[in-house]
Structure formats: C-alpha cells, structure tokens
Amino acid sequence: VANYDYFINTDVDCILDQDTLTKVILPVLDSKVDVIAVGATMRMSNGCEVEHGIMKRVRPPKGMIPTFQETEYLRSYLLAKMGWSAFNLIPNVSGGFGLFNRHIVIEAGGYDPLSHAEDMDMTLRMVALMRENNRKYKIVQIPDTCCWTEGPPTLKVLNRQRTRWGRGLLQIF
C-alpha cells in the first residue's frame, strides 16, 4: 500500500538506476497539470555487469534474442513513446517500470488482478477517467534509462512472453 502521492511499479527482476527517483519525479514537479504517469526507457541487463544490485558496466546483450529485444525496446521507448509523449498520447506505461499518481490509480479502480496486461488496462482506465471528467492530465515518457531487466534468453521464453502479452491485449479489447 502506497502512502505518498506517487508510487513506482516495477517487476521483481528489474534493477533501477541509482537516480531513478529524481529522474521520474522531475516531470511531475515541472508540470502545471496533473501528471498521472511517467514512463522511462527500459534496457536489457543481459551482458551488463551488476554488483549488489547496482549497474556497474553497461554492455550489449549477449545472444541474438536479448539483442533483438534490446533493439526493440530502444525503438519503442526512444522513438515511439517519446513521439507519443510530445502529443500526450501514450497508450501504455510499461508494467516493467512506471511512476503512477496514486490518487488517479485508485479512482480508476487500480490494478485488475485478472488482467494479463494490467499495465495497459490500468493506463487506459486512467486516461478514460480523466477524459470523461474533462480533467487536464499528462502522461510523460522520459528518455533516460531508469530500469534494467533480464531479457528472454531463448526463442521459447520469448514466445511465452509475447503470447502472454498478446493474450493481455485481446483481454482488454
């Protein structure tokens, strides 16, 4: 249970950059309208040097599958989401990492425990809540890498991940 106005949601296997909190709270502090969520770039930790939960050295992923996902993440976060952010049209703040306005999350019904795409489901409900009530809001994507995650090492694991993501999207629509 969160006690403050904003909370971070992240996956258990993620490593957060040391100055993550500073990076993601700045758009909230600089905004004149409610920032309901902030997303940041996620990268693959495969191949990086991590010591006691701290990223010591960034290296490209080892292996074709993690390299594929790293490239896909960079395209998604640095090109697509940064572009959508400029127009306040981000459809989803990643479940892997995001800062959320606690009050809006609660008002929108919170996470659906039955959803397989809880990140997109909740983001869409938050946006719907704000639009239906004619409330000004922003969802911001920052270019900074704040979160590192272990990418699927094999095609089989990647397939399971993508199947779950696909089921979640179908469940929402």
Spell out what each predicted region is:
Residues V1, K23-H116, M130, T163-L170:
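Long helical/loop segments within the catalytic core of UDP-sugar-dependent glycosyltransferases
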Residues V12-P27:
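Acidic donor-binding/catalytic loop of UDP-sugar-dependent glycosyltransferases
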Residues I15-L16, R43-S45, D121:
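A short, conserved beta-strand element in the Rossmann-like catalytic core
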Residues K23-V24, M122-R125, Q161:
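Alpha-helical scaffold elements adjacent to nucleotide-binding pockets in ATP/GTP-utilizing enzyme cores
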Residues H116-M122:
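Acidic donor-binding loop at a coil-to-helix junction in glycosyltransferase catalytic cores
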